[in-house]
Amino acid sequence: MTLITRVLNGNLPLRLSTLKAARQLQCGYSSHAKYAEHKPIERIRNIGISAHIDSGKTTLTERILFYTGRIAEMHEVRGKDNVGATMDSMELERQRGITIQSAATYTVWKDVNINIIDTPGHVDFTVEVERALRVLDGAVLVLCAVGGVQSQTLTVNRQMKRYNVPCLAFINKLDRMGSNPYRVLSQMRSKLNHNAAFIQLPIGVENNCKGIVDLVQERAIYFEGEHGINLRLDEIPQDMRVESQERRQELIEHLSNADETLGELFLEEKPFTEADIKAALRRTCIKRTFTPVLVGTALKNKGVQPLLDAVVDYLPNPGEVENLAYIEQEGQEKQQIVLNPARDGKDPFMGLAFKLEAGRFGQLTYLRCYQGALRKGDNIYNARNHKKVRIARLVRLHSNQMEDVNEVFAGDIFALFGVDCASGDTFTTNPKNNMSMESIFVPEPVVSMAIKPNNTKDRDNFSKAIARFTKEDPTFHFKFDNDIKETLVSGMGELHLEIYAQRMEREYGCPVTLGKPKVAFRETLVGPCEFDYLHKKQSGGSGQYARIIGVMEPLPPSQNTLLEFVDETVGTNVPKQFVPGVEKGYREMCERGMLSGHKLSGIRFRLQDGGHHIVDSSELAFMLAAHGAVKEVFQNGAWQILEPIMLVEVTAPEEFQGAVMGHLSKRHGIITGTEGTEGWFTVYAEVPLNDMFGYASELRSSTQGKGEFTMEYSRYSPCLPDVQEQIVRQYQESQGLGQPEKKKKKN
């Protein structure tokens, strides 16, 4: 009888403390030595756990930390014991049972260091997922066995594709009523376009969930003892042998299509060994040509240890992923440099700041080291502003707890204190190499709300909170609107802004009032419009003189959130030193349109010719000429308003399908697809964000509280003519003006 099995028969508190000691004893390390040790690059994995909201990511991470001996006992997400999950360290997260910030931790499994980032599933916190994926080498995509592929799963999948992150899929919640992992697999193939196949099968689902079948090693695995800590290996049950053979054959066929080596064995009809299949799984997973699908239920402690084995066996180490830096020099194209992932510290240090957080000891900056080594006392430079920083303290994170380390190497994720920087900044030890890493993609905010502190005495704390949150989160914007004399905050959704309002009260003692949500409309041109503007001012002494000629035209619909400036001038009519002034003036005018007061976007400004005066011309004069040219185009061009369109997914019982479809149509929604299963239906639609406010309460009342929906930003699209007229009228009234006689889009 092993030490662990003997302990399982004792009393619970003793059992749990001894269990942890026993697990550390098995690994042959004391707790601190085990985690502080530096490993060779083959023994490191940087992984993220991503999924749709409520798929069980945080519960899965909690189980991983428990089985690897990182925590002594497990807690649930909405903790009945008032403790909450380890990774949900923010009080608000424990209350709501959702993950808001990406918590970072590291642990050890089979002598491999695993750095884990637990990411939010709610679409309003999508920038947290972007940041996490940017610095990871692999990911676990968690899917619900009942819900399957949902809207945020599609978003996470797109983000993984953007950053080329290899992934494993884990179908969780097999114990839930209505779970169907086979349907989820077919959705992965049809909706996510993954070449995916099971490498495990469930032995029973719902209340009959007993264990799993490993198709690679052809054996059954049962999870026994306290918290499923003992693995019992057995033969595949008699009633599952035919299905196991069929699914193993399917796995080999999918792998053979993606892997040349295995494909040759398959065509020559040679026998496969377990090692052949494992090697092919690793090669194809790293290349993103195949996605291994695992199954389990984290809440019921089944399938987690084999998932950890798969992370070690199939996901890449930092040396197997190519990371690039760019050398930027004026007047030259960006030059790509492949970074050296070796953990010897011979190359200069390169690191990327992917997250900022205001902790108890000042600003905490999370970094990933991509090349070289960093030690306490070293100096590093910010590639963006060339500021020098001395490293006083290096820490590794376990949720909100810190462990000091003396040095970090390529592949490590760590944090620094007191570094003044922005998310996405590159740090290096050599300030002269002009190298920087690609910055993190940040989506534009789509919702604004007026915000004000309830008490005037809290203004100082309000300012501190705003300053901290805007620095931490690049999707959270803040500005004071002079026209309406209100402070506006903008973000990715109502929940996003509500959570910041609650954090202000909780963390800064500053209760605030949020106004009604406002949509971030845009204004754009319908067709090209030429301009020829002369700015001339003579008031004694040197005057101002600038003439610019060109055309403003719409960009293609796929680029309608961008602004472009093109200098097409030839000769010296517009001296080159004044061209930046024209661009600056154009971009300043694009901050506020004249139709509705919203930003201009989807426009290209082509500067073709102009004129200057040898004495009176200056950059300021050309900037003011650009202001005048944009005003001229506003008067002469045809304009339209763009609005954000959201991808909406609604799930409800079948008897409410008619009501749900009717409500979406009433809100100008376009139904793009429907599907149904076992008494429930899901409808997919594209709906203008402006029409989605108040939908949550309408859905609850029309489905007796059983319906739920998610939405995410899709694109900007022209709004309907009557909506445009209403927006323009409201803007004119707010400015105290009558409706202008203005050319509108002819429909």
From Swiss-Prot:
Gene, per the UniProt record: mEFG1
SMART domains per the UniProt record, alphabetical: EFG_C, EFG_IV
Keywords: Elongation factor, GTP-binding, Mitochondrion, Nucleotide-binding, Protein biosynthesis, Transit peptide
Pfam families, A to Z: EFG_C (PF00679), EFG_III (PF14492), EFG_IV (PF03764), GTP_EFTU (PF00009), GTP_EFTU_D2 (PF03144)
Transit peptide: 1-32
PROSITE patterns associated with the record: G_TR_1, G_TR_2
GO molecular function: GTP binding; GTPase activity; translation elongation factor activity
GO cellular component: mitochondrion; nucleus
Cited InterPro entries: EFG_II (IPR041095), EFG_III (IPR009022), EFG_III/V (IPR035647), EFG_IV (IPR047872), EFG_V (IPR035649), EFG_V-like (IPR000640), EFTu-like_2 (IPR004161), G_TR_CS (IPR031157)
Subcellular location: Mitochondrion
Biological role stated in the UniProt entry: Mitochondrial GTPase that catalyzes the GTP-dependent ribosomal translocation step during translation elongation. During this step, the ribosome changes from the pre-translocational (PRE) to the post-translocational (POST) state as the newly formed A-site-bound peptidyl-tRNA and P-site-bound deacylated tRNA move to the P and E sites, respectively. Catalyzes the coordinated movement of the two tRNA molecules, the mRNA and conformational changes in the ribosome.
Protein name (Swiss-Prot/TrEMBL): Elongation factor G, mitochondrial
Claim: GTP-binding is one of the keywords in the record: yes
Family: Belongs to the TRAFAC class translation factor GTPase superfamily. Classic translation factor GTPase family. EF-G/EF-2 subfamily.
Binding site for GTP: 51-58, 118-122, 172-175
Superkingdom classification of source: Eukaryota
Residues of the tr-type G domain: 42-319
